Amino acid sequence: MPAGTAARAWVLVLALWGAVAGGQNITARIGEPLVLSCKGAPKKPPQQLEWKLNTGRTEAWKVLSPQGGPWDSVARILPNGSLLLPATGIVDEGTFRCRATNRRGKEVKSNYRVRVYQIPGKPEIVDPASELTASVPNKVGTCVSEGSYPAGTLSWHLDGKLLIPDGKETLVKEETRRHPETGLFTLRSELTVIPTQGGTHPTFSCSFSLGLPRRRPLNTAPIQLRVREPGPPEGIQLLVEPEGGIVAPGGTVTLTCAISAQPPPQVHWIKDGAPLPLAPSPVLLLPEVGHEDEGTYSCVATHPSHGPQESPPVSIRVTETGDEGPAEGSVGESGLGTLALALGILGGLGVVALLVGAILWRKRQPRREERKAPESQEDEEERAELNQSEEAEMPENGAGGP
């Protein structure tokens, strides 16, 4: 149940109970003392009275003793017959009854229905938008209220007037959480709107209400936002995989309609000028392609604030192995075959060049030896002549001695 409905139902039940039971509805702030008077009770002893209560602290009716007891820290009877709750809490919500006999001997009953409340801090709009775009959904912000009891409600206002969600141009997402220890509530309300074109600078605010009498709502600081006209989407592009749109029979073709626009437009597909009966999607998958899938494809993007925009067409063609144009998967194989052939030719030329070089080198070796042989013979003749001249000089030197 939404927090607002729960609060209104609580107020209605409280009013009906007071009317039917003839009791009095009491609201007390959490943590503050509360005094309930016992009607008809004498202000001074001797007194004949009885207080009993049924609250979150008890499983059934609890009768309090005028002489005091363990419950004095929670609720105790004062000398004048009134009941004091030193510090009310959520567990003190419930029914309190007093039965007293006045001086005339008449019995008087008092009934109280006690509810507690806690006023939270001032609500706040977190993550507010800096501007709004016309004709498209925009998140205005999130209104947050912390530390309330009961939960209460959050409401949005536009230019000072209550903004009622319609589920179309005005959307509100609410969330209510309760602290497991304190029992206090935290409320969050996210507002999304679709501004109209040509609008001015709208002012948004949020308010919190406990739904109790004589309690004024708490308001956030207002935020004023600028509404800008949506610009035309950029060019639409149709991507195809495999590139070129050529595929072997049984292969897969993926068509992607790429367009930069916010919010994303609806994309429909066209084949050979006729719309395809498919759900809107920016991706078209063609598995196990056959010749019946051949044709010209294009995509049409429809933006809320602009007319439809069609992409340039692409052609899908199914080719058998050996046909003109390589089939999908054969491009890499033919490329590798060509590379291997080129490497084989280069390797063969290299071997031939090595053989020719070896043959030429072998032919040049005998010529070099022939050239070296005469040179060595002349050297020997020169050496012989030198030796003869040296031998002739030696006797002459011997004859000239003493």
UniProtKB/Swiss-Prot annotation:
PROSITE patterns per the UniProt record, alphabetical? IG_LIKE, IG_MHC
Q: Which residues form a coiled coil?
A: none
- Signal peptide (UniProt feature, chain positions): 1-22
Q: What is the effect of changing S376E?
A: Phosphomimetic mutant which does not lose the ability to reduce DNA damage
User: How does the record describe the protein's post-translational processing?
Assistant: Phosphorylated on its cytoplasmic domain by PKCzeta/PRKCZ upon ligand binding. Phosphorylated by ATM following DNA damage. Targeted by the ubiquitin E3 ligase subunit FBXO10 to mediate its ubiquitination and degradation.
The source's superkingdom equals Eukaryota
**Any one Pfam family match given in the protein's UniProt record, by short name:** Ig_2
What are the UniProt keywords, alphabetically?
Answer: Cell membrane, Cell projection, Disulfide bond, DNA damage, DNA repair, DNA replication, DNA-binding, Endosome, Glycoprotein, Immunoglobulin domain, Inflammatory response, Membrane, Nucleus, Phagocytosis, Phosphoprotein, Receptor, Repeat, RNA-binding, Secreted, Signal, Transmembrane, Transmembrane helix, Ubl conjugation
Which InterPro entries would you find in this protein's record?
CD80_C2-set, Ig-like_dom, Ig-like_dom_sf, Ig-like_fold, Ig/MHC_CS, Ig_sub, Ig_sub2, Immunoglobulin_dom
Which residue ranges are assigned to the Extracellular compartment in the record's topology? 23-340
Q: How does it sit in the membrane?
A: Single-pass type I membrane protein
Q: Where is the Ig-like C2-type domain?
A: 123-219, 233-315
Could you list which ranges are Cytoplasmic topological domains? 362-402
GO CC terms on record?
A: apical plasma membrane; cell junction; cell surface; early endosome; external side of plasma membrane; extracellular region; fibrillar center; nucleus
Positions glycosylated per UniProt: N25, N80
Positions of post-translational Phosphoserine modification: S376, S389
What residue stretches are annotated with the Ig-like V-type domain? 23-109
Annotated region Disordered: where?
Answer: 295-332, 365-402
**Record-annotated disulphide pairs:** C38-C98, C143-C206
The compartments listed are: Cell membrane; Cell projection, Phagocytic cup; Early endosome; Nucleus
Ranges of biased composition (kind: Acidic residues): 376-394
**Annotated consequence of substituting S389E:** Phosphomimetic mutant which does not lose the ability to reduce DNA damage
Please tell me what else the database record remarks about this protein: Reverses DNA double-strand breaks in diabetic mice and improves lung and renal function.
The entry describes its oligomerization and partners as: Constitutive homodimer; disulfide-linked. Forms homooligomers. Interacts with S100A1 and APP. Interacts with S100B, S100A12 and S100A14. Interacts with TIRAP. Interacts with HMGB1. Interacts with LGP2; this interaction plays an important role in AGER-mediated pro-inflammatory responses and cytokine release. Interacts with double-strand break repair protein MRE11 which is a core component of the MRN complex; the interaction enhances MRE11 endonuclease activity and promotes DNA repair.
- State the name under which the record lists this protein: Advanced glycosylation end product-specific receptor
Which organism does this sequence originate in? Mus musculus
Name the gene behind this protein.
Ager
